[in-house]
Regions:
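Beta-loop-alpha module in the N-terminal Rossmann-like domain of NAD(P)-dependent dehydrogenases
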Residues: 77-140
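Short, well-ordered coil/turn segments that N-cap beta-strands
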Residues: 31, 55, 80, 119, ...
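N-terminal Rossmann-like dinucleotide-binding module
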Residues: 21-77
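A contiguous active-site-proximal alpha/beta segment in oxidoreductase catalytic domains
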Residues: 128-171
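Hydrophobic residues in well-ordered beta-strands that form the structural core
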Residues: 35, 123, 148-150
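Bacterial N-terminal signal peptides
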Residues: 9-20
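Bacterial N-terminal signal peptides that target proteins for export
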Residues: 1-11
Length: 171
């Protein structure tokens, strides 16, 4: 899957709101998605979109044993795909992209683990705990030619997509 298709699929399957267009899952292979952390509330968005078929969860890394054992993904993802260690999950499952659903303090470590492996990352807002972390994450993404996305809710509003289309067509 080329970077353009990964980028398109990444944005589509990780949105927290429905987009104004759909992805023809028959044209693209499902995105191989890793999950880093299970404590963020947006994890439920992945759960309700699993059946669409445009992505598959191929690994879940959660260091906290209680969270690893007791989380909603356990009902939909095979228990053999859960790992205590992020790097082990990345090396064994080889995801194309990872969603960070843990602490903001973990965002830098997730990008440090993923970017050198060529794995794209989506983090929840805010991007980082400080500018040093944000700059390091941006540098890692640039140096490794990977996408780093911060999930801002308004990005997925249909009205914003329509406004962009109207402005683009006027110019």
């Amino acid at each position: 899957m080329n970077t353009k298709n990964i980028f398109k699929t990444f944005f589509l399957c990780l949105s927290v709101f429905s987009l104004s267009f759909t992805l023809n899952a028959q044209e693209l292979k499902p995105l191989r998605l890793g999950v880093a952390g299970v404590s963020h509330g947006h994890l439920h968005e992945v759960l309700i979109r699993l059946e669409r078929g445009d992505f598959e969860i191929i690994g879940v890394a959660e260091p906290d044993e209680q969270l690893r054992v007791n989380n909603p993904l356990r009902k939909k993802v095979d228990s053999s795909l859960f790992y205590a260690d992020l790097e082990e999950m990345l090396d064994k499952t080889k995801p194309e992209a990872v969603v960070a659903y843990g602490s903001i303090y973990d965002h830098l470590a997730i990008v440090e683990a993923c970017a050198p492996r060529g794995i794209h990352v989506m983090v929840e807002k805010p991007l980082a705990v400080n500018m040093n972390h944000a700059n390091r994450m941006a540098r890692l993404a640039r140096e490794n030619n990977t996408l780093l996305l911060t999930n801002y809710e308004t990005t997925w509003y249909d009205t914003n997509h329509e406004a962009y289309r109207l402005i683009k067509n006027e110019n």
